[in-house]
């Protein structure tokens, strides 16, 4: 019997991450990179672990504080924070920020998720698919000061979010988004990085020509809304891409 090729990959042992959520006492400064200041508990919990990452976060923090104004947010509104230094990236948003947003929404359903910039505006659709409608953005070019913010932990390491939590996020999205698989998965999809910010495929035209022989479709997910992406993946039998 031929062993499935995926069996050659070793399973990695890691502690699955589930974000803790809580209300911070007093007034806290929140930067556009998601660092929480003035808190012995929440400042380290808002940054990934690892020396080189923390050095980079410190550089970004100092630059941000030196160049951006500080705006006090309304005291009569409860704000939740779910972003970090890397969550403008789609992978980190889906696997880190969405679980954090769900944790806040379940514990504090009246909290408004506060996102740091217009770069995140296209992510609002993913929050609505979780049933989160109250979404706001940092004032343009600013860091913010918030009284008693609702905070969620940043993962210590990348790619460690609890699989059970990710499945919960997925199931809620499918339910709230009213997604139904009307057809069995029958597509072979190749996700191109042609419109990505980096990690381009040097021989992509040749690769796409070869995949076309197997009736694979080449797509740029940047051209699809979130709901369109979910619908496409429901039709996908074989997915091909890189990270």
Regions found by a protein language model. Give the residues of each.
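The feature primarily captures lumenal catalytic ectodomains
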Residues: 1-243
